[in-house]
């Protein structure tokens, strides 16, 4: 599955046009199994919801052209230290897993009706929702910074580090800022992200992508 996720990482782009076709029972079951695994592993409360009523804000409805999608991942968990980062990491996994299973996704951190969604997953901190469904297209690659703009390595960078940076640059970030810096020394890697309302989520997404590209067995987060 790691190889499939790596391929999905290269193919996955934000999709805002969906064809309105609902998820099949098999697709929902496949996604729910992944949600359950992530919740158990990281002690989260992510939910896959079906909603005829749109959970989008006015801005979200404006950005989504064509037919609306009615399936969403609600990224939720107990309000604790690093919960945003943990949900960003898990959300990234779900996006790539959906892509690997022929579906498309859209992160909607700032474009959903928070009051309505809170009623669906009560008593938890909700950091974002992710639309999931059948896209009319596969989206387009986002503009990207260069490897030199976001990373440095003490000495000659090993292949795993370079592959990790390439993967991190494929990660979706809030308004495509890519406001991260990754530094390496030996097998130790540090990640810093410019402070902002979405920085925790973005940091988790970047970590997930870097690990897929570099291989978790090759380094340690410092």
Task: Tell what function each PLM region has.
Residues 1-222:
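Acidic, surface-exposed loops and disordered segments
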């Amino acid at each position: 599955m790691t190889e499939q996720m790596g391929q999905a990482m290269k193919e996955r782009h934000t999709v805002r046009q969906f064809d309105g076709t609902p998820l099949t029972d098999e697709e929902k079951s496949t996604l729910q199994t992944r949600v359950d695994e992530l919740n158990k592993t990281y002690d989260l409360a992510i939910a896959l919801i079906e909603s005829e009523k749109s959970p989008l804000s006015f801005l979200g409805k404006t950005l989504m052209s064509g037919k609306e999608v009615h399936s969403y991942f609600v990224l939720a968990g107990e309000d604790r230290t690093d919960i945003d980062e943990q949900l960003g990491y898990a959300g990234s996994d779900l996006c790539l897993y959906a892509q690997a299973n022929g579906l498309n996704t859209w992160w909607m951190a700032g474009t959903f009706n928070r009051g309505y969604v809170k009623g669906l997953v009560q008593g938890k901190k909700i950091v974002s929702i992710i639309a999931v469904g059948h896209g009319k297209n596969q989206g387009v690659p986002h503009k990207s910074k260069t490897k030199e703009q976001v990373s440095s390595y003490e000495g000659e960078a090993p292949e795993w580090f370079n592959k990790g940076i390439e993967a991190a640059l494929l990660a979706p970030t809030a308004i495509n800022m890519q406001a991260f810096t990754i530094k390496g020394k030996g097998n130790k890697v540090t990640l810093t992200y410019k402070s902002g309302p979405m920085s925790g989520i973005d940091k988790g997404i970047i970590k997930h992508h870097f690990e897929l590209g570099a291989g978790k067995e090759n380094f340690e987060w410092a």
